[in-house]
UniProtKB/Swiss-Prot annotation:
Its main location: cytoplasm. InterPro entries: DNAAF3 (IPR039304), DNAAF3_C (IPR028235), DUF4470 (IPR027974). Residues 522-536 have a biased composition (Polar residues). One of its GO terms (cellular component) is dynein axonemal particle. This is Dynein axonemal assembly factor 3. GO terms for biological process: axonemal dynein complex assembly; motile cilium assembly. It comes from the Eukaryota. The keyword Cytoplasm applies. The keyword Nuclease does not apply. The gene is DNAAF3. Required for the assembly of axonemal inner and outer dynein arms. Involved in preassembly of dyneins into complexes before their transport into cilia. Keywords: Cilium biogenesis/degradation, Cytoplasm.
Length: 544
C-alpha cells in the first residue's frame, strides 16, 4: 500500500541478487561418510544440494571456485526459483563464467558479469553480448540434444514443456525480440518505482539513502559501502560504474519481468521492474573478502569501497574457475589441465569433476517429496529469506539423515526494524523445527545465516545463535518477505507466450503499486483487448 511517506516495500516482489555474502556450500554440507566412501572406493562421492531462491548463482560459483580446496566430489545443484526470468539469468551467468578464456579475457568477463548482474543500464558492448548470448540460448532451449552437447552442465529435464517455451520467450526478448527503448524503458521505470517507494520523501531521497546506509547497512556489517556509490545506485540503478557514467544508457533487459495486473475488472499483462531498490547488489560479493587487506580501515574509514571489493572478488572467482571453463572438463571429460606455460616442467593439475545444475519446475517445492528420486536425496538444503514460507516437513523429508539446512536471514533488508529482524529469526527457528531440523551446536554467531541439521542424528559442532526461541509478534508470524514469491495468479509467464490464467485475478497492494512502473504490454496472445483492458495512463507512461 502506498502512503504519503512511501510504500515501504523497497525489496520488491522479484529478487535479482542475493542479500547475503556468497558461501562455499561444501563448507556448509556434512563431510563425506567414510563408510559410504569405502563402498564407492572407485567412484567419486556426490554432493546433492537443493537451493530455494538463490536467484543469482553466487553460492554455486563460489562452491565451484573453492572446489580445489576439498576432496574431489561431483556436484549436483538443484535450483528452484519462483520466476523463469531468474532461471534465465542463472543460465546466462553460468554461460559467462564458463566462457572460453580465448574468446573473452578475465577482466572483460568480470566487468561484463558485474554490469549484467547488478546494473539497470549497460554499456553498448555489454548489451551486444547479452543479445548474442540470449539469441544462442533461445535456439538451444527447445533442442535438448544440442543443449546437452553445448551446455553439458545444464539440465532442464524437470521443467514443464510450457515453462521451457516461456524460458525461450525470455531469451528472445533479451535478444531484442521487441525493438526500441520503449520495450523496456528502464530509467523511467526505475524513477517511477523510486517515487512510489519514497512518496513525499522523494525530494529528500539523498538524505533517505544516507540514513539507510549509515544507520542500517553500516550498523549491520556493510561498512565498506560508500555513500557515493550507494547514492548513485539509488538514483540510477547503476551499482558498478566501471567506465564514464555517460557510457551507461542501454536498458538491462535481464531485469525485466512480467506480471498480470487487474485494471477495471480485467486482467492486464504488463512488463516492468519489480526488483530491489533499497539494498542493492553490494552485499553478495562486496562486504567480505579472503584478502583481509581489502577490508582494512584508515582513520576509521574503509580504504576500499564495496564496488572495488566486488571487482576483486569476482575476478578471483573467475580465475579460480578457469579449470571448470576448460573445454574438455566442461564437457564432462575430466583430463589434465595444463599448468603454466607451454613446456613447463610443473605437473598438470587434475581437472575437476563435472557438475550439473538442475532447474526444477516452478512451485514444485510442495510436491518434491512425492517423487522417490528426491526423498532423502540432498545433503544440504539452502533457503533464501524470501522463500522461508516454503520450509515444511515435506521439504525436510527430501534431506538425507545428517543433512544440513542453511537459511538466509533478513539482516540486510533496510525496510525491517531490529525487532522485526529478531522476530523473523525466531520464525525461521520455528519453521525449521517443524520441518524436522535442530540448531547446530557451537560455532561462531551469525546474523546473516541460520544453520540447522536434520534432527534425529548426532549434533554437529556448529550452531547459529541468531536463531532464538520465542513467539514473534503477530505481524511477523508469517514471513515478512513472502512478497518475493507473489501468488501464482499475480505472476505471469513471459509476455511473448502463454495465456492469462482463467481464474479471477486479485489485485494485491503490491500489484496496485506496481501499476506505476509497468510499461506498455506487448502484442500477442496475452495482450488485452483495447476496448476493455486499456492500461491506465500511469502504466503506459510512468511518472517522469
Amino acid at each position: 500500500m502506498t502512503t504519503p511517506a512511501g510504500s515501504g516495500t523497497g525489496f520488491g516482489s522479484v529478487s535479482w541478487w542475493g542479500l547475503s555474502p556468497a558461501v562455499d556450500l561444501q563448507a556448509e554440507s556434512p563431510p563425506v561418510d567414510p563408510d559410504s566412501q569405502a563402498e564407492t572406493e572407485h567412484e567419486t562421492p556426490e554432493l546433492n544440494v537443493l537451493l530455494l531462491g538463490s536467484v543469482d548463482g553466487r553460492h554455486l560459483l563460489r562452491t565451484l571456485a573453492r572446489a580445489a580446496l576439498w576432496p574431489r566430489r561431483r556436484f549436483h545443484f538443484y535450483v528452484l526459483e519462483n520466476n523463469l526470468e531468474a532461471v534465465a539469468r542463472h543460465i546466462l551467468i553460468f554461460s559467462l563464467a564458463l566462457e572460453d578464456p580465448e574468446k573473452m579475457g578475465l577482466q572483460e568477463r568480470s566487468e561484463t558479469f558485474l554490469e549484467v548482474w547488478g546494473n539497470a543500464l549497460l554499456r553498448p558492448p555489454v548489451a551486444a553480448f547479452v543479445r548474442a548470448q540470449a539469441g544462442r540460448l533461445a535456439h538451444l532451449v527447445p533442442e535438448p540434444d544440442r543443449l546437452a552437447e553445448q551446455l553439458p552442465w545444464l539440465s532442464l529435464g524437470a521443467l514443464k514443456f510450457r515453462e521451457r517455451d516461456a524460458l525461450e520467450a525470455v531469451f528472445r526478448f533479451w535478444a531484442g525480440g521487441e525493438k526500441g527503448p520503449e520495450a523496456f524503458p528502464m530509467s523511467r521505470l526505475w524513477d517511477s518505482r523510486l517515487r512510489q517507494y519514497l512518496g513525499s520523501r522523494y525530494d529528500a531521497r539523498h538524505g533517505v539513502s544516507d540514513w539507510d546506509l549509515h544507520m542500517k547497512l553500516h550498523d549491520r556489517g556493510a561498512r565498506v559501502i560508500h555513500t557515493r556509490e550507494f547514492r548513485r545506485w539509488r538514483d540510477t540503478g547503476v551499482a558498478f560504474e566501471l567506465r564514464d557514467s555517460s557510457a551507461y544508457h542501454v536498458p538491462n533487459r535481464t531485469l525485466a519481468s512480467g506480471r498480470l495486473l487487474s485494471h477495471r475488472g480485467e486482467r492486464v499483462a504488463a512488463r516492468g521492474y519489480w526488483g530491489d531498490i533499497a539494498t542493492g547488489p553490494f552485499v553478495a560479493f562486496g562486504i567480505e573478502a579472503d584478502d583481509e587487506t581489502l577490508l582494512r580501515t584508515s582513520n576509521g574509514q574503509p580504504v576500499k569501497t564495496a564496488c572495488e571489493i566486488t571487482e576483486h572478488n569476482v575476478a578471483e572467482l573467475f580465475r579460480e574457475m578457469a579449470a571448470w571453463g576448460h573445454p574438455r572438463a566442461a564437457e564432462g571429460d575430466p583430463e589434465q589441465v595444463q599448468g603454466g606455460a607451454e613446456g613447463s616442467s610443473e605437473p598438470a593439475a587434475p581437472a575437476p569433476e563435472p557438475f550439473t545444475v538442475h532447474f526444477l519446475s516452478l512451485d514444485s517445492a510442495h510436491t518434491l517429496h512425492h517423487k522417490s528420486c528426491y526423498m532423502g536425496q540432498f545433503q544440504l538444503l539452502y533457503v533464501a529469506c524470501g522463500m522461508v514460507h516454503l520450509l515444511s516437513a515435506e521439504l525436510g523429508a527430501c534431506v538425507a539423515p545428517g543433512g544440513r539446512l542453511i537459511v538466509e536471514l533478513a539482516q540486510f533488508l533496510v525496510d525491517l526494524r531490529q525487532e522485526q529482524l529478531q522476530a523473523f529469526s525466531s520464525r525461521v527457528g520455528e519453521l525449521a523445527q517443524a520441518a524436522g531440523f535442530a540448531p547446530q551446536l557451537g560455532g561462531k554467531p551469525s546474523d546473516t545465516f541460520a544453520r540447522f541439521y536434520k534432527a534425529g542424528d548426532s549434533a554437529p559442532g556448529h550452531e547459529d545463535p541468531a536463531v532464538e526461541s520465542g513467539t514473534p509478534p503477530p505481524e511477523v508470524l508469517a514471513p515478512p518477505l513472502e512478497a518475493t514469491d507473489p501468488p501464482s495468479e499475480d505472476r505471469t509467464q513471459p509476455l511473448e507466450s502463454g495465456n492469462p490464467p482463467s481464474e479471477p485475478l486479485k489485485l494485491t497492494s503490491e500489484s496496485q503499486a506496481s501499476l506505476l512502473e509497468a510499461s506498455v504490454p506487448p502484442t500477442g496472445s496475452q495482450a488485452p483487448k483495447s476496448e476493455n483492458q486499456t492500461v491506465p495512463p500511469e502504466t503506459k507512461y510512468p511518472i517522469p
